[in-house]
Amino acid sequence: MSPKHILTDPCTLVVFTYAPAGLGHLRVTNSLSAGLPKGVKTVLLGSSDKGIEAIHKFISIHVVTRRLMEWFQRGRPQKIFTFFYRKYLRSYSDEMKRKIEEIFEQQVDIPKKVVIVATHFGLAHKIAKVKKEIEKKTGAKIILVVQVTDDTPQYIWYVPGADVIFVPSRRTMLELKEYALKSNLEKVKIEVLPYPVNPLLSKKLSSKDYDKRIRQVSEGTGEVIDFCMPVPGAAVGMDFLHHLIPQLQSKYSRFRFHIVCKEVPFTRRFLEEVRTFPNVQLHTSKHDREIVDVYDKIYEENVISFEVTKPSEQAFKALYDFDMRGGSVLLFSNPVGRQERDNLDFLRRHGLIFDQKITQRLWSYADDGKSMSGVMKKSLMTECNALRCFQLPFGSQRAANFIWWCLKNRVFECMISNYSNAAANSDFETRSNGVEQFWSKVSLLV
């Protein structure tokens, strides 16, 4: 039996955890689930901890609390904060223990091995606290696998008691290891794997669809240009999108916008207003899981060439090549929080996005309406043959002007024509097969 097929053993159960803290953790869970071998028994374990959801929204939306939280994410304040927050999370683990025990009770065949995949640190700490107790009670072997969902070495992601922690980069691995050593914490295995992007979107486009993507990013073709605009779970950035769409529509009437948004009270007004905009297709649901599914469906049923998004876990869609279903040009709004800046840093280190100096130079050209010389364009694009995304300037009007300037100056067209799959995938960290690697590694632990 091959390592991955060990997971299909009837006595093995895979449990995916889910926390109500934005859509990012669920997107990663969805990606991992999509790459499982057929025949694996799975269960989704959700948390009803409203505190996690409330804290996430409060910090994401309010500027003062966001800045305070960022202060706690660096240096000595981070170390102190992590110490107390970890204790807090582990002290409220009774509900998690009860839910895992219920999973055992609900199985017809009592599992002997249970793989629990945690994509949120809060749930990971709670599970780690009760893991040995449940093993003793059930006689089963529990393997706790933690997947870090941003390339951020925040200390709270170090989970004593986990069997393995997967991180997107060597940098994050080394910083977490150093923190654990200096803090005298229980040793946990940390491994670097490519970020687990959804394998369904790594499928190659047909030659017809790839040509369509090329036409969409090219100037003067008259093609309908499809944008995907996912609204974050905490609904950050709605005002930006609300103003960006008409700004773009005023420049070209054949832009088409696919907006993915959860239906909650604080998105109602946004949805009511953008519904009246021309060429806007709304994809909404009241349920997180449906929102994640509909996002994937948009890419599967359309040739999406641009995505305007936050540099959250969505930043790692840059691991798709342009000839893949999910390989749209990524256009990032202003980063919010340390983890989003860390994700942008990951992209810069690997040449998937321009550095700040070149980015600001391009912004300046767009602001002044200057044409980009052929020599400069060729030089930039030839040197940066792994380029996948751009950071947008602050403000919806400047962002719209920049996107239009890039189209008129054939920047996007040139970027794709000079793109090299080999260059973009030259480093292990930037490959799109992270899900396959994940399950191969997990199989060896079972």
Regions found by a protein language model. Give the residues of each.
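Nucleotide-activated sugar donor-binding and catalytic core shared by glycosyltransferases
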Residues: 1-446
